[in-house]
Every structure is written in C-alpha cells, then in structure tokens.
C-alpha cells in the first residue's frame, strides 16, 4: 500500500496513511492505466574523484521544464534543461540527460555530492490540490483523473525516486517552492543584502512572497496564498487568448507592447 512521511507537515503520521489509502482506493475505482515510459537510470562515465570541494545537485522535475544544476562551493558550474537533450518542448520527465551533463561538466560522480536538493515540498502541494479538488467537485473530476496518476507514481516519492535513479545514498533536501524562487534570485545576484519579491502561479500554497536576503541566509517575511494568485490570473488570460498555459505566457509578454 502507498505510504509517505514528512517531518514537518500539516498532517500527522496517521493523516499521511489516510491520504495514501484514499488516493489508492480512488485510483483503483477510476481504473486508470498509466502508460508513462520507464525512466532510465542516470549514469556518468567519469571516474570518482577525491575532491575536497562541496558539490550540490539541484533537480526540478514532473511539472514543466525539468532541469538540473550543479553548484560547486556555492557557485553554479553547470545547469541545463532536459528539453535541450530530448528535443521535447517543456519536457517534464525526470532530467536524466541534464543530470548527466552536470555531473560530467563537474567531472564527478553521484557519490561525490554533498547533497541533492529538490525545488518543491510535494506533500504540501498535494494537500493544497486535494483541498482544491474537494472545493470544486464534481467539476474537478476530469482534472483529478488527469493529475493523480503522476502523483501516485512519482511525486509522492521524490527522495526514493532520486535514490533509485541515481543510485545515491547521501542527503536529499526538499525545499519550499517559494524559498527556491527567493534563493535563485538572491544568491545569483551581486548583492550581500536585499529585499526579494517572487510572484508565480502557485507553489505548495504560496502564490507570491517577499523576504530579505542577508549573506547566506534568507528570511521569509510575508506570503500570499492560494487561491489568490496574480500568476494564475496571468495564466487565465494566456489561455483566453489561445496560448498554452505554463508555456505561452512569454507570448503574452510579447503582445504587451502592442
């Protein structure tokens, strides 16, 4: 049976089991057939190094534009989107090729990594989605059927999936979605201290956030939560004008000057 756990969650351990059982029973009743291709294991031909450097691998997958990045002693040395290798636009699959590229660029193997970071807290994201499906039922049934298979197969088990596909036994971190946005903005900037604003469609619950970056730390000050979302409003207009959501938003930006 399905089971997942998290140290800091809105749910208790018993709550996790209830959600897992609920999902399992729901999927069985819907009789959904999952036809996703089997994910290949990530490998690198480079020999293991005896480096004294600290390497962190960042991974984004299963939403849109899967990607990987490698950080060496606090600096980005490699980054790539999976679509650059697969030639599939907005490729959302586990970024095997992007990970291999980053490891080979750094001339390291998986065992040389101090840790692997995933950009999102999938358990809290599922909590928000279940709330949304319940609030909009029965109109949400089609979305439920389309969305849940990937959650049951992949997204609830990100740490396990990473360990299996990369043959990795080290530390794995799941960050909060908007903290990942704040970090990518601040740590790549030339500033030692700055206010940081991030606005997107939705993360776990947050849709916009503001924080302060100072040195190697970020303090979250305020969040706006789902269903209030400037980003989702932008996506609604993207769809209204005939473009694909999570892909065609830049075309709306291009239309703005006209």
Task: Give, region by region, the residue ranges found by the protein language model.
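A general, composition-driven signal for non-globular sequence regions
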Residues: 7-10, 40, 245
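Catalytic His-Asp segment of secreted/periplasmic serine-dependent ester chemistry enzymes
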Residues: 1-33
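N-terminal secretory targeting modules
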Residues: 30-49
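Proteins with a high burden of low-complexity, intrinsically disordered sequence enriched in S/T/G/P/A and R
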Residues: 1-4, 28-36, 67-69, 237, ...
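Short acidic/glycine-rich loops and adjacent helix/strand connectors
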Residues: 43-258
